[in-house]
UniProtKB/Swiss-Prot annotation:
S-adenosyl-L-methionine binds at G78, F83, A129, E130, R148. This is Ribosomal RNA small subunit methyltransferase G. Its main location: cytoplasm. It comes from Streptococcus gordonii (strain Challis / ATCC 35105 / BCRC 15272 / CH1 / DL1 / V288). One of its GO terms (cellular component) is cytosol.
């Protein structure tokens, strides 16, 4: 997908990018490739692939009508090089984006990226999702949590649901749809007072299948969740 094809596809779906937004995506690509030589950010570095598999893939929640250009507080867990939240932030500048990542080198990249792209209302924190979720400044503070290919729902729900306000939504972006994954996660979702609201399936322009599971938080999360760092993975709920 060339940048031109990227713009055209967005245009067909009612999103007209300004020259500034096009420049932001271009600069994002340049910095991603440049920094990838120093720290491992992505295996995808060819320009057309980045525009398809990182940029276009990341804005799926926008294209699927799950996010609009309001000042929603959005948390991105395990964003790596900023996916999916920062491409959405470029398109919808009103979003207030927070990223938590366990690798400080990636946080340094994201800080530089945000500065270079002139993004405001973006906040980056180095640490574990399990730890920040017990902090009052983060717990139950977000309207939306996004996670792209981070973990199975059984684990992911414990890492993300505590951050949501009641009525807030987790958007889990995945490349494969395993009905048994949601079946396995039933107990975890019940314990966390949350419910699968939707399971969307669509395809990238090259035909690759993609899925977004939407989970809504129904009641406050019990204080004991999430458990200590590492536990959700070792002993899923």
């Amino acid at each position: 997908m060339t940048p031109q094809e990227f713009y055209q596809l967005l245009s067909q779906q009612g999103i007209e990018l300004t020259d500034r937004q096009k420049d932001q995506f271009e600069r994002y690509f340049e910095l991603l490739v440049e920094w990838n030589e120093k720290i491992n950010l992505t295996a995808i570095t060819e320009k057309n692939e980045v525009y398809l598999k990182h940029f276009y893939d990341s804005i799926a929640p926008v294209l699927q009508g799950l996010i609009d250009n309001q000042d929603h507080k959005l948390l991105d867990i395990g964003a790596g090089a900023g996916f999916p939240s920062l491409p959405m932030k470029i398109i919808y500048p009103q979003l207030d984006v927070t990223i938590i990542d366990s690798l400080n080198k990636r946080i340094n990249f994201l800080k530089l990226l945000a500065e270079e792209l002139g993004l405001d209302k973006v906040h980056f924190y180095h640490g574990r999702a399990e730890d920040f979720a017990q902090d009052k400044a983060f717990r139950a503070q977000f309207d939306l949590v996004t996670a792209r290919a981070v973990a199975r729902m059984q684990v992911l729900s414990e890492l993300t649901i505590p951050y949501l306000k009641v009525g807030g939504k987790l958007l889990a972006l995945k490349a494969s749809n395993a009905p048994e994954e949601l079946e396995e996660a039933k107990n975890a979702l019940n314990l966390l007072f949350s419910k699968v609201q939707d399971n969307l399936s669509y395809a990238l322009p090259n035909g690759d299948p993609r899925f977004i599971t939407v989970v809504e938080k129904k009641k406050e999360t019990p204080n004991k969740y999430p458990r200590k760092a590492g536990m959700p993975n070792k002993r899923p709920l």
